[in-house]
Every structure is written in structure tokens, then in C-alpha cells.
């Protein structure tokens, strides 16, 4: 049974495939773009719009966040964490956040 399945699979892979009618229509559609066209537009850096801050809150504390343009991060000063913004999209996953109070914690441990 396995050999029959393998044989059918190898025969199917060796045959030249004709595009379906739907695929042909999609390729000829006026909005269809090549991969090169998409790469040209993707090179432009996307920026974060600070107007989004009124809708975004920290997923851990549910408190508003502060945008830091120099580091391109959303900062929660209360918890001391910063969420990165990648291609204009905030990464609000808590595991992706970095701590901002690391230096303060190191100084406290040295004093004790």
C-alpha cells in the first residue's frame, strides 16, 4: 500500500501542472504584483503613530503606555518594562518586553 502511494506521489510530481482557471485569473488581475514590486515598497520604514497610544494599554497592568521615539518602544514606567515596536507594529507580548530598571536593581544589590 505504501509503495502504491509513493508511486502515485512521484508520478504526480513529475507531471507538468497546468494552472487552474482561478490561478490564471489571479495572475492576470490588475492588482496582482510581482515579488519585486512588493520588496520595493517594503523597504520604506514604517513608523509608529503616537495617536494609537489612546487605544493601547500594557497587557500586564492594563495601564497606559508612554512612547519613547529614541528607542522606538512603548514604556510602562510603573512596571519598568519596554515593548519593542517592529516595522511600526508594537509587539505587546510580555515575553518580548525588556526591563528598563535593570541598572536600578543592580545598584540596589551592590548597596546591600
Swiss-Prot record:
UniProt superkingdom: Eukaryota
Compartments reported by the entry: Mitochondrion
UniProt-listed Pfam families: Trm112p
Residue stretch of the organelle transit peptide: 1-34
Subunit organization: Interacts (via TRM112 domain) with NDUFAF5; the interaction is direct and stabilizes NDUFAF5 protein. Interacts with COQ5; the interaction is direct, stabilizes COQ5 protein and associates PYURF with COQ enzyme complex.
Residue ranges annotated for the TRM112 domain, each copy included: 49-95
Main location as per UniProt: mitochondrion
Biological processes annotated in GO: protein stabilization
Keywords assigned: Mitochondrion, Transit peptide
HAMAP family xref list: UPF0434
Protein name (Swiss-Prot/TrEMBL): Protein preY, mitochondrial
GO cellular component: endoplasmic reticulum membrane; mitochondrion
Assigned protein family: Belongs to the PREY family.
Name of the gene: Pyurf
Function, in words: In mitochondria, S-adenosylmethionine-dependent methyltransferase chaperone that supports both coenzyme Q biosynthesis, by stabilizing its components, such as COQ5, and NADH:ubiquinone oxidoreductase complex (complex I, MT-ND1) assembly, by stabilizing complex I assembly factors, such as NDUFAF5.
Amino acid at each position: 500500500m505504501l509503495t502504491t502511494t509513493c508511486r502515485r506521489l512521484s508520478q504526480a510530481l513529475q507531471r507538468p501542472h497546468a494552472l487552474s482557471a482561478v490561478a490564471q485569473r489571479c495572475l492576470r488581475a490588475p492588482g496582482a504584483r510581482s515579488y519585486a514590486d512588493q520588496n520595493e515598497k517594503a523597504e520604506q520604514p514604517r513608523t509608529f503613530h503616537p495617536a494609537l497610544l489612546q487605544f493601547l494599554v500594557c497587557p500586564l497592568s492594563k495601564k497606559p503606555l508612554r512612547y519613547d521615539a529614541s528607542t522606538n518602544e512603548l514604556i510602562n514606567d510603573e512596571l519598568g518594562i519596554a515593548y519593542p515596536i517592529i516595522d511600526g507594529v508594537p509587539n505587546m507580548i510580555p515575553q518580548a518586553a525588556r526591563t528598563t530598571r535593570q541598572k536600578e536593581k543592580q545598584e540596589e544589590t551592590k548597596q546591600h
